[in-house]
A protein has these predicted regions:
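C-terminal motif of bacterial Sec signal peptides marking the signal peptidase cleavage site
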Residues: 14-16
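Positively charged n-region of N-terminal signal peptides that target proteins for export
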Residues: 1-4, 18-19
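Buried hydrophobic residues that stabilize the cores of well-folded domains
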Residues: 19-310
Length: 310
């Protein structure tokens, strides 16, 4: 899990090389990419910092450092990026700290033109490979299938099976229905641990404005989002290539998130909560800082902040 969190944060910054949608150009325009990103917790203490090296319009490397409550580094992650043309071919990650086994891995990417069709993550210190295959209908992502090894039992013995995560996308105007099915296949081919979930996203103007999740007939959740009209450094042509399902992520909309209203219904009871985001912008309409608040007892309580240096 720690590797996943680190990996998501690093690749989120990695692909935030903003350039206006101009064909399939995925190089970086000077002044629009945050070369240094600092994350602070609700108490204003630095939780992590990410610094990237950029040359020739490309990110060549990045380094993330994670800190404890006392400000001491507890974990680092260093990335070396290689390209094929303007597309990322490989990301080699070396991690140190409390969980180096899952912080050290290599990701390789395969394309059909500029469409990502396969990504493979190989861990360096544990024997584990995760593969994701992507399918499209024209320019629309229709299916993702992720496979990874998992320990299971068969005939009373511990054996290695394969966990599948199949994600299907169905489009109907502004609404996108995402069906996710997970299951484990044992060496004999027997399938177990099946689970299916549905989420509906409403996307308007390049932003997710609503997310609807049904957990059971008596448990549902709806999240409604609002945005500013400024530039979001986390969305660009490279984002759309390297993260094909970017369009269902609230943080990867065309603009920056302002509010999130979460309505949960459980056993005929309704619970509502809100989150807020405040920004300071530079003269190019990119955020230089983001403050995150949660509503508690009708008051806004700090929940963390981010600082961007371009």
């Amino acid at each position: 899990m720690k590797k996943v969190i680190l990996g998501l944060v690093a690749i989120a910054a990695l692909v935030s090389c903003k350039k206006e949608d101009n064909g399939n150009d995925s190089t970086i325009q000077e002044g629009t990419f945050p070369k240094e990103v600092t994350y602070k917790n609700e108490n204003g203490k630095v939780a992590s910092k990410l610094v990237s090296l950029i040359e020739g319009g490309k990110i060549l490397s990045s380094e993330m450092e994670i800190y404890n409550e006392n400000g001491s580094p507890i974990r680092t992650q260093k990335d070396i990026i290689t390209y094929e043309g303007n597309l990322i071919k490989k990301r080699e990650t070396t991690g140190t700290g409390d969980d180096p086994n899952y912080n050290s891995f290599t990701e390789t990417f395969s394309y059909d033109g500029t469409k990502l069709v396969k990504s493979v993550t190989d861990y360096k210190k544990v024997v584990k490979t995760i593969t994701t295959i992507y399918s499209y209908d024209g320019d629309k992502l229709t299916n993702m299938v992720k496979t990874e090894p998992i320990q299971t039992t068969e005939n009373g013995q511990r054996v290695e099976g394969t966990k599948y995560t199949e994600t299907n996308f169905t489009y109907n105007g502004d609404r996108i229905t995402v069906k996710e099915k997970t299951y484990t296949k044992k060496p004999s081919g027997f399938i177990t641990d099946e689970n299916t979930s549905f989420k509906i996203y409403t996307v308007v103007g390049g932003n997710v404005v609503k997310k609807e999740v049904t957990y059971s007939p008596s448990a549902k959740e709806t999240i409604e989002y609002t945005y500013d009209t400024k530039n979001n450094p986390m969305v660009n042509n490279l984002t759309k290539i390297i993260l094909p399902d970017y369009f269902i992520e609230k943080s990867r909309g065309r603009n920056n998130l302002l509010t999130a209203t979460i309505t949960q219904v459980r056993n005929n009871q309704t619970f509502v909560s809100k989150e807020y985001y405040e920004y300071v912008y530079n003269d190019k309409d990119y955020p230089t800082s983001q403050k995150h608040f949660i509503e508690e007892n009708a008051q806004k309580k700090p929940a963390g902040s981010i600082e961007f240096q371009y």
